[in-house]
Regions:
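ATP-dependent carboxylate-amine ligase
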Residues: 2-124
Length: 124
């Protein structure tokens, strides 16, 4: 759990959580500080990419404003009602100013396909 950016409008947290149990715990900690959490999950490990944890992830996505990185086409279809693929347009929407501070929680064990850098560059 590493805060990599913090301002009046946004906080960005990078966490190595890449298993549903760890992701749930990290969300819980983040929400203790701020209820307005956007979750970005990178499906980087073999078990995540193979879909072994898809059902558990759907349960997590149902309860959070969620985005996925590195999902297969099949997973994107499965997650469609609960999480959207992270794109440049999604990032623009995510970073829009609002009346309250937003926490962006990035859970994964890879590099988020460069999206983390794009988010940070957009905030700085």
């Amino acid at each position: 759990y590493d805060t990599i950016f913090d301002s009046e409008s946004h906080k960005v947290i990078d966490d190595f959580a890449h298993h549903p149990t760890a992701i749930k715990e990290t969300i819980k900690i983040a929400k203790e500080e701020n209820e307005d959490v956007a979750l970005i999950v990178e499906l980087g490990s073999n078990s995540m990419r193979k879909g072994i944890h898809d059902d558990a992830l759907i349960e997590i996505f149902k309860e959070n404003h969620s985005y996925v990185v590195s999902a297969s086409e099949e997973q994107q279809k499965k997650f469609a009602d609960y999480a959207e693929p992270l794109t440049e347009n999604a990032i623009k929407n995510l970073l829009q100013k609002s009346n309250s501070k937003k926490t962006i929680l990035m859970c994964g064990n890879k590099n988020f396909e460069g999206f983390q850098t794009l988010i940070l560059d957009s905030l700085i």
